[in-house]
């Protein structure tokens, strides 16, 4: 192979590696607590959400999926004092969102799944504010650090995310009823929750197809140049 061809191969190889790296980027969904769900330690003694969170890496555009019931709430804040006090009622900085309001009066709690987008870098704090912070004080809390990663999707910004409350099923007394899924308004979810595994790296089918095509392109060109 001539020196010029060898240089071309090296350039193409570098370009292919860069393309593969870019196409491999994908937003992630993290199921909080995995099979434990989102409950205080009085209900789930094995729950250790901070330990779970410390084993993950979070970036902008990722989602946290809270599988819980209508008797537990999901509160997100950027204020450490609010988090430490397990109390969001007196928060005055407009930096706290109650994604799911609990319903303590319900005689038969219904399963609920809440999808929370990560739209701000830095420290993000989560807890259940139900029963005057009692659930939070009994282990239902954790903090994470969100990095920039590949940034937010083009169609989203921190102001796009609404904070809807849980919608109860019409069969509230049926323990086997499928959980409702609450997705923030005007925010493109990176994957279909129902068809994906816990903590599985995901992106759209278009991205997956693009990765495959890029890989094939690289292998074909490398094979062609290797034959010379």
From Swiss-Prot:
It is a lipid-anchor; GPI-anchor. Disulfide bonds join 86-136. May act as a carbohydrate transporter. This is Early nodulin-like protein 18. Residues 153-170 have a biased composition (Low complexity). Belongs to the early nodulin-like (ENODL) family. The lineage of its organism: Eukaryota, Viridiplantae, Streptophyta, Embryophyta, Tracheophyta. Residues 28-148 form the Phytocyanin domain. Keywords: Cell membrane, Disulfide bond, Glycoprotein, GPI-anchor, Lipoprotein, Membrane, Signal. A lipid is attached at residue 204 (GPI-anchor amidated serine). The keyword Cell membrane applies. GO terms for cellular component: plasma membrane; side of membrane. Glycans are attached at residues 29, 71, 94, 145. One of its GO terms (molecular function) is electron transfer activity. It comes from the Eukaryota. Mostly expressed in seedlings, roots and flowers, and, to a lower extent, in leaves, stems and seeds. Residues 188-204 have a biased composition (Basic and acidic residues). Residues 148-211 are annotated as: Disordered. Its main location: membrane. Residues 205-228 form a propeptide. The keyword Transport does not apply. Residues 1-26 form the signal peptide.
């Amino acid at each position: 192979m001539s020196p010029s061809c060898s240089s071309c191969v090296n350039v193409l190889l570098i370009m292919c590696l860069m393309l593969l790296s870019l196409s491999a980027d994908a937003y992630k969904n993290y199921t909080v607590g995995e099979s434990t769900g989102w409950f205080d330690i009085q209900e789930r003694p094995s729950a250790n959400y901070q330990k779970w969170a410390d084993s993950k890496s979070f970036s902008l555009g990722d989602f946290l999926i809270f599988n819980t019931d209508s008797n537990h709430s999901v509160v997100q804040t950027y204020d450490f004092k609010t988090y430490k006090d397990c109390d969001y009622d007196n928060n005055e900085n407009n930096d706290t969102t109650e994604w799911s309001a609990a319903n303590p009066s319900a005689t038969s709690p219904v399963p609920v799944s809440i999808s929370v987008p990560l739209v701000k870098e830095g420290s993000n704090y989560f807890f259940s504010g139900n029963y005057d912070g009692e659930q939070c004080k009994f282990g239902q809390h954790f903090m994470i650090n969100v990095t920039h990663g590949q940034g937010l999707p083009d169609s989203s910004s921190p102001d796009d995310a609404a904070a809807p409350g849980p919608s109860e099923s019409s069969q509230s007394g049926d323990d086997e009823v499928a959980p409702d899924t609450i997705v923030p308004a005007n925010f493109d979810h990176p994957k279909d929750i129902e068809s994906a595994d816990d903590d599985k790296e995901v992106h759209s089918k278009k991205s997956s197809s693009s990765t495959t095509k890029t890989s094939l392109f690289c292998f074909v060109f490398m094979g062609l140049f290797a034959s010379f």
